[in-house]
Amino acid sequence: MEPLVTHKGKAAVLNRINVDTDQIIPKQFLKRIERTGYGRFAFFDWRYLADGSPNPDFELNQPIYEGSSILIAGENFGCGSSREHAPWALDDYGFKIVIAPSFADIFHQNCFKNGMLPIRLDYDVWKTFAASYENKGYEMTVDLEKQQIEDHEGNITPFDVDPHWREMLLNGYDEISLTLLLEDDIQAFEDKRSSWLRA
């Protein structure tokens, strides 16, 4: 994965609570195991009308949000089934960071595992961000190293992130590459095993 240290991008607001993974990526599109190609199906039932044309009333279809890479979402984002396709779809859509008051636990972990940064903010702080950025097309800068967000006016907001996941994103590690960093320790342990336990 690519390291994520700082990211500057346009923020889009999807102010809906309890957005579940089936709304993020409907089940009929989960027939592939590749991680790419899901962006066009993200929020499919909201994003398109019955005839396949874009729904002009869907928030993320507003021209002001075109090219957004930061999603300001509502409470309990990513609830529902634990499909990893949900962060795949968001990432392929173009989102690298999701900011919300709360996330479903499995979705929260799946974001980190797929190189995305989910940021939890206290509700009142999140509410200010949502109001400031709704239908504006403003940019913000997220600094994972400093654990802070700089808004379009230069205001700084700190955020917390688990040290383990922070280190993974800063270095671009996935779980396999992190395990390989311990290859010497693993081999040393294996060498100490009794011969009849070795493959």
Swiss-Prot record:
CDD domains found in the cross-reference section: IPMI_Swivel
Swiss-Prot/TrEMBL catalytic activity: (2R,3S)-3-isopropylmalate = (2S)-2-isopropylmalate
GO biological process: L-leucine biosynthetic process
EC number(s) per entry: 4.2.1.33
One Gene Ontology term, aspect cellular component: 3-isopropylmalate dehydratase complex
Class of the enzyme per the UniProt entry, highest EC level: lyase
Highest rank taxon of the organism: Bacteria
Molecular function GO labels: 3-isopropylmalate dehydratase activity
Pathway: Amino-acid biosynthesis; L-leucine biosynthesis; L-leucine from 3-methyl-2-oxobutanoate: step 2/4
Protein family per UniProt: Belongs to the LeuD family. LeuD type 1 subfamily.
Subunit structure: Heterodimer of LeuC and LeuD.
Listed HAMAP family: LeuD_type1
Function: Catalyzes the isomerization between 2-isopropylmalate and 3-isopropylmalate, via the formation of 2-isopropylmaleate.
Protein name in UniProt: 3-isopropylmalate dehydratase small subunit
Naturally occurring in which organism (per UniProt): Bacillus pumilus (strain SAFR-032)
